[in-house]
């Protein structure tokens, strides 16, 4: 079975994969795999960008997101007349002819990766560039998104040949068993800048400990007084900052969002 392994922590947001997908499918009809992708309104692969934290402690994550080519694909169950099928290699394909008029296929996807083409009245999505995989004379033998990435964020191949140790899937609660795996998905962080209000100077070398009772992380403020602890679970944390006999204790929640604490006075 084929699938994708996406290294989210390596993605720099250049959108080359997204552009490659557009270049491959806009203006090109790859029947029986897919009709043309509209130039606007559809991104069969999209780099989802999200800002984390609060100013000035902010970072941006980029997560390339194609069709998840699920083993238990809801779109297959929602389709009539076998309009959506799963190939022997694991790729999920929408038959453009059989799927005409079946808008319920779009609504079935829990990932929002199936799009409705108003003009053609068909659902459309990523095909895994099956037309390239099946064509021995094609210039490449992998999906365009894979070929286009300059830093090898996206891998494609047999699942048992990909290094999936520690990999995750999106929305595992859906029970769809996606064949798109991720490493380096963003976890929560707590960050801040420590200073002493008496002389309005930053504190270098302060020890910062973050614990939820079972996990403990430690950092030391740098020459700018900054600390940054990431890889945190969604939880309630006790943050202890200590330096030169002074200590400050904060209770911080990362349940809903990352926390950039801004300037923290150590008194």
Sequence positions of predicted segments:
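Flanking helices and flexible, charged tails adjoining ferredoxin-like Fe-S electron-transfer domains
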Residues: 29-66, 76, 96-196, 267
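Short Pro-Gly-centered beta-turn/loop motif in secreted/extracellular proteins
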Residues: 203, 226-238, 244
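Short, acidic Ser/Thr/Gly-rich low-complexity loop/linker segments typical of extracellular
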Residues: 212-226
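Short, ordered, surface-exposed loop/turn motifs in non-cytosolic proteins
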Residues: 188-190, 197-213
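Ordered, amphipathic secondary-structure segments that act as subunit-interaction surfaces
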Residues: 69-79
């Amino acid at each position: 079975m084929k699938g994708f392994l996406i290294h989210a922590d390596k993605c720099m947001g250049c959108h080359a994969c997204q552009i490659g997908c557009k270049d491959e499918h806009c203006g090109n009809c790859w029947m029986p795999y897919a009709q043309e992708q509209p130039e606007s309104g559809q991104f069969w692969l999209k780099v989802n960008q999200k800002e984390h934290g609060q100013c000035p402690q902010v970072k941006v994550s980029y997560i390339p997101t194609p069709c998840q080519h699920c083993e238990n694909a809801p779109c297959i169950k929602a389709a009539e007349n076998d309009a959506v099928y799963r190939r022997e290699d694991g790729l999920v394909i929408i038959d453009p002819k059989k799927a005409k008029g079946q808008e319920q296929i779009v609504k079935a996807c829990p990932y929002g990766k199936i799009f409705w083409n108003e003009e053609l009245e068909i659902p459309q999505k990523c095909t895994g560039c099956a037309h390239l995989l099946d064509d021995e004379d094609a210039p490449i033998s992998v999906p365009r998104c894979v070929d286009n990435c300059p830093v090898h964020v996206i891998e494609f191949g047999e699942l048992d040949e990909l290094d999936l140790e520690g990999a995750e899937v999106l929305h595992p609660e859906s029970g769809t068993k996606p064949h798109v795996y991720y490493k380096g998905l963003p976890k929560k962080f707590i960050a801040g800048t420590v200073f002493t209000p008496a002389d309005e100077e930053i504190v270098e070398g302060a020890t910062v400990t973050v614990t939820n009772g079972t996990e403990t992380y430690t950092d030391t403020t740098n020459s700018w007084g900054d600390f940054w602890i990431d890889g945190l679970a969604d939880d309630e944390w006790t943050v202890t900052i200590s330096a030169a006999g002074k200590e400050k204790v904060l209770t911080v929640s990362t349940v809903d969002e990352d926390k950039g604490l801004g300037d923290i006075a150590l008194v």
